[in-house]
Amino acid sequence: FNKFGKARLYYEMSLEEQDQLFESTKKNVLPTITQMNLKYAISAKNRARTVAGVSILSTMTNRQFHQKILKSIVNTRNAPVVIGTTKFYGGWDNMLRNLIQGVEDPILMGWDYPKCDRAMPNLLRITASLVLARKHTNCCTWSERIYRLYNECAQVLSETVLATGGIYVKPGGTSSGDATTAYANSVFNIIQATSANVARLLSVITRDIVYDDIKSLQYELYQQVYRRVNFDPAFVEKFYSYLCKNFSLMIFADDGVVCYNNTLAKQGLVADISGFREILYYQNNVYMADSKCWVEPDLEKGPHEF
């Protein structure tokens, strides 16, 4: 009887009906309600967590819209986002080797975002939606895409929440039960890491930089950030390869491990843990305590937690 749980209604729809529903979300905003539930788990920590159960209509239409990019994230190996990669059959070893390779004078560090789902700024959650939807250039018109964004914001960002008998409007942040939560958190994580590096590199006094290539990179970055209206894709590739070489990332939702070049970090050319703290403080409004982050100079020991 209950073989699909509460989702039974959706799964009994034919594929044509599912497509019709999806098409209607490109012209209308579906009104849905999200239910807040207390998470039931055995934990050493003395605290309650909540899980937001997003409506099946919202979940399925969002997944249908983002399906291509989500599948490509899941099926791509040796990329910064490791969602979908197995840790068995040598997968974990492979991920760590891939993280460390090519980085000179490597040091590992990791962090944990305090109150990640609750503290995420609305603008960054919207940005994550836009980044995930960036491939929809040929298949949808602009108005269809903007309605998809409206739907996603109405159902994930500031939707109506049913909590213990009262109905509230959520002020923002991520819904933990949304279909794209893990992916959006990963995008957010990459944005924070990149922001930390951009801020750190721009804050260095140019005459103190001993490497000429990094000096010119800093100048170009300054031009891109402060002088230009439209960014230069070639520079984005250049900066990306600089980060890959000196600030290698491994990301799973809001967890992350970084292998960075310690020589450059001491000169302030790539971000270290203090750079992360600063970015979190002014971009996420949370303070990251010592207990939330770790740095490990000895690669033999590996990451502390991931």
Curated annotation (Swiss-Prot):
Region (RdRp Fingers N-ter): 1-75
Cited InterPro entries: DNA/RNA_pol_sf (IPR043502), RdRp_CoV (IPR046441), RNA-dir_pol_C (IPR001205), RNA-dir_pol_PSvirus (IPR007094)
Cystine connections: none
The enzyme's E.C. designation: 2.7.7.48
Pfam families in alphabetical order: RdRP_1
Keywords: Nucleotide-binding, Nucleotidyltransferase, RNA-binding, RNA-directed RNA polymerase, Transferase, Viral RNA replication
Annotated region described as RdRp Palm C-ter, given as residue ranges: 174-306
Annotated region (RdRp Palm N-ter), positions in chain: 76-114
Domain Nsp12 RNA-dependent RNA polymerase: 1-306
Nucleotidyltransferase found in the keyword field: yes
Record region (RdRp Fingers C-ter): 115-173
Similarity field: Belongs to the coronaviruses polyprotein 1ab family.
Described function: The replicase polyprotein of coronaviruses is a multifunctional protein: it contains the activities necessary for the transcription of negative stranded RNA, leader RNA, subgenomic mRNAs and progeny virion RNA as well as proteinases responsible for the cleavage of the polyprotein into functional products.
UniProt name for this protein: Replicase polyprotein 1ab
